[in-house]
Amino acid sequence: MYIEIMDTTLRDGEQTSGVSYTATEKLHISRLLLEEVKVDRIEVASARVSSGELEAVKSITEWAAKAGYLEKVEVLAFIDGMQSVEWIRKAGAKTVNLLSKGSLKHLTGQLRKTPETHLSDIRQIVANATQLGMNVNLYLEDWSNGMRNSKDYVFYLVDNLKDAALQRIMLPDTLGILSPDEVFLFCKEMCERYPDVHFDFHAHNDYDLAVANSIAAVKAGVFGIHTTVNGLGERAGNTPLASVVAALKDHTAVNLQINEEKLTLTSKMVETFSGVRIPANKPVVGENVFTQACGVHADGDNTCQGRISGAFTQTVDGGVNSVYSCIDGS
């Protein structure tokens, strides 16, 4: 089974406190992700944020159109009539990621709308956008709470949208509340109820479970996973791109087109542009990943090479580095 990787470093990742990219930095990251890392899609902005953001997206779409990547460049849109869609068209993008409410609590408390009205609004925007030749994906914001507390509402929406002109329906664990067991059960329920729908899973890392939850979603049958470079994002961040790629490659039978050899370079670039340091012990891309101070472990790797295998070695550009310490056995 082929799994799409959609990276949202430039949209959800930029919601990290203190992080703001220049237009030039956004273009560099976009090119690296699509040309070198070969992620399937990138989400680069939220519509209607600012005139500066509009210009940044234009620079990305102008390059992407020439390079053949335009439909891989996605922008978040809101339920605001056609204002977001028109902003995205003006920016030169072709793919709309429409943000709808995936829980009844969010719908009634935040938007103060009925399910019927919300459904009508969604259908109208989808119809109008597709008439303009645009692709539309749909986020079900707070879907995780929706499945826990208002499942009938979730099913009402998808029952009435499964035949709409949607490319994908995207399932966010917006507040990072789910365990891998819940993710598997909820995603499996969605995939079995709607076998013809392409579902993505969008994890947040509040319990340090984003990678585990993403793997659980893949095992349940979703076709896409959302990531950010270095796990950037609000609160505890999103699913780290390098970590989930290594885990999927080494622990599942799915197919990816990711070039693992470029992941460390990408992490370093985003570290520089974002100003958010990569911890030395960060899995896969941290500088201590292949550094060992314990003599027993170092000897085991030297003689058996038991831990170093598969995508993990390709992801990190280097071999094991043994260092002197009080427990090195020398």
Regions found by a protein language model. Give the residues of each.
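Terminal or standalone catalytic/regulatory effector modules within metabolic enzymes
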Residues: 28, 34-59, 313-330
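Short gly/pro/ser/thr-enriched loop/turn and capping motifs at secondary-structure boundaries
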Residues: 104-106, 208, 231-236
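Active-site PLP-lysine loop of aminotransferase-like
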Residues: 174, 226-235
